[in-house]
UniProtKB/Swiss-Prot annotation:
GO terms for biological process: L-leucine biosynthetic process. GO terms for molecular function: 3-isopropylmalate dehydratase activity; 4 iron, 4 sulfur cluster binding; metal ion binding. Coiled coil: none annotated. The keyword ATP-binding does not apply. It comes from Synechococcus sp. (strain JA-2-3B'a(2-13)) (Cyanobacteria bacterium Yellowstone B-Prime). The lineage of its organism: Bacteria, Bacillati, Cyanobacteriota, Cyanophyceae, Synechococcales. Binds 1 [4Fe-4S] cluster per subunit. This is 3-isopropylmalate dehydratase large subunit. Pathway: Amino-acid biosynthesis; L-leucine biosynthesis; L-leucine from 3-methyl-2-oxobutanoate: step 2/4. Its EC number is 4.2.1.33.
Length: 467
């Protein structure tokens, strides 16, 4: 068949059958689990006396609730200790590969799977976490799922899903200095809206995407969900193959060449039919900062907060709610907004290249008085490699705290939390009310380099002035 997208090809290759409901029973090649959304799923298996059908296709780690400042057991938070003990027990009982703290492999689930070569082109991947879309950077179809679906994958290695439409999003041209993948995805969400992708898979392409590293592509695909899409992906290419070459769980030897040949065949056909195509120009994308309470409420760092009358009518009431919550006014420049906390990390921006870019800004500077700034590597491997490169010394010399891997302040299910009305500059993915631990805390989303710039300035600044 011709005129097929990668999504079509991967979907068809993993289709078990069409269910009476019209949904597709889809085989899941890799299942990733963590301590927060898996305990109830295992409990449901026990209630029904069901085994894990393919334990070798499931990989577990701890990331959401684990503290990043003190790993001594038992953890100070009894709930964290209980949930991690439960995951340890479940993995032992069912023979599931488990990367615990101190193994050298622990980290945020969407960081460790790619870095070990577990994530491969053409896979279907599921995890009880919405940012599973990250793995689409490799040309995989990856979904976040709920706890009952975690149970289904454990028991059957399949999911019942409705096939998505496909929207191709092209970014043409070259990104300017100080503009990163985080700015690209925030720009896309700003333009298409937080509900614009509902019912879609996003296929990213164009010269700006092709020029991105794999870690940048992961950032892009990671936040597809914030744009309403169920998943996002990039067609595999030479950049993909070079990243995967030699990684532990990637094909080796003669299997490698065979795998690459198949991966190449997965790319969307030149005449593939899309349900929609949207084109952006890289030159129009500036360092971007969110000012409101959804990831779609973002502006270029050199812009002012929009007035209600400048927004579509459907967005005006939410904008008024955001002005009040954030204590920001229409017409205010986003530059100069003071910050209390600066967080670099998360499955969006906790990889080695993210830390390198932030370190370039931190080097030779100091965190501003009154600002708490900390860096949370996305995995134990990222932490080790960053330390070998001297990044830890750069950050600590600048006054940043250097932490152990975990989700940290992205969702604050751990001790890393805002207090009261504190406002954070954050490299994470969501800025909802109360997202970072305090019911009244405020979040400004931006790239890691922009976070570092805010940390040393005590306020939002244009990172391009510090390059």
């Amino acid at each position: 068949m011709s005129e097929r997208t990668l999504f079509d090809k991967v979907w068809d290759a993993h289709t078990v059958r069409i269910l009476p409901s019209g949904q597709t029973q889809l085989f899941i090649g890799l299942h990733l689990i963590h301590e927060v959304t898996s305990p109830q799923a295992f409990a449901m298996l026990r209630e029904r006396h069901l085994p894990v059908l393919f334990p070798e296709r499931t990989v577990a780690t701890v990331d959401h609730i684990i503290p990043t400042d003190n790993r001594a057991r038992p953890f100070a938070d009894p709930l964290a200790e209980e949930m991690i003990q439960e995951l340890e027990r479940n993995c032992r009982q069912y023979g599931i590969r488990f990367y615990n703290s101190g193994s050298g492999r622990q980290g945020i689930v969407h960081v460790i799977a790619p870095e070990q070569g577990l994530t491969l082109p053409g896979m279907t991947i599921a995890c009880g976490d919405s940012h599973t879309s990250t793995h689409g950077a490799f040309g995989a179809i990856a979904f976040g799922i709920g706890t009952s679906q975690v149970r289904d994958v454990l028991a059957t290695q399949t999911l019942a899903l409705s096939k998505l439409k496909v929207r191709r999003i092209e970014i043409h041209g070259k990104l300017g200095p100080g503009v990163y993948a985080k700015d690209v995805i925030l720009h896309i969400i700003r333009k298409l809206g937080v509900k614009g992708g509902v019912g879609y898979a996003y296929e990213y392409g164009g010269s700006a995407i092709e020029a991105m590293s794999m870690e940048e592509r992961m950032t892009l695909c990671n936040m597809s969900i914030e744009g309403g899409a169920r998943c996002g992906y990039v067609n595999p290419d030479a950049v993909t193959f070079e990243y995967l070459r030699g990684r532990e769980f990637a094909p080796q030897g003669s299997d490698w060449e065979e795998a690459v040949a198949w991966w190449k065949s997965l790319a969307s056909d030149g005449n593939a039919r899309y349900d929609d195509v949207v084109v952006f120009q890289a030159a129009d994308i500036a360092p971007t900062v969110t000012w409101g309470i959804t990831p779609g409420q973002g502006i270029g760092v050199d812009e002012r907060i929009p007035a209600p009358e400048d927004l579509p009518e459907s967005e005006r009431e939410l904008a008024k709610e955001a002005y009040a919550y954030m204590d920001l006014q229409p017409g205010d420049p986003i530059v100069g907004t003071p910050v209390d906390v600066c967080f670099i990390g998360s499955c969006t921006n906790g990889r080695l290249s993210d830390l390198r870019e932030a370190a370039k800004i931190a080097k030779g500077r100091r965190v501003a008085p009154g600002v708490k700034a900390f860096v949370v590597p996305g995995s134990e491997r990222v932490k080790q490699e960053a330390e070998q490169e001297g990044l830890r010394e750069i950050f600590e010399a600048a006054g940043f705290e250097w932490r152990d891997p975990g989700c940290s302040m992205c969702l604050a299910m751990n001790p890393d939390r805002l207090v009261g009305r504190q406002i954070s500059a954050s490299s994470s993915n969501r800025n909802f009310k109360g997202r970072q631990g305090s019911p009244s805390g405020r979040t400004l989303l931006m790239s890691p380099a922009m976070v570092a710039a805010a940390a040393v300035s005590g306020k939002v600044v244009d990172v391009r002035t510090l390059l």
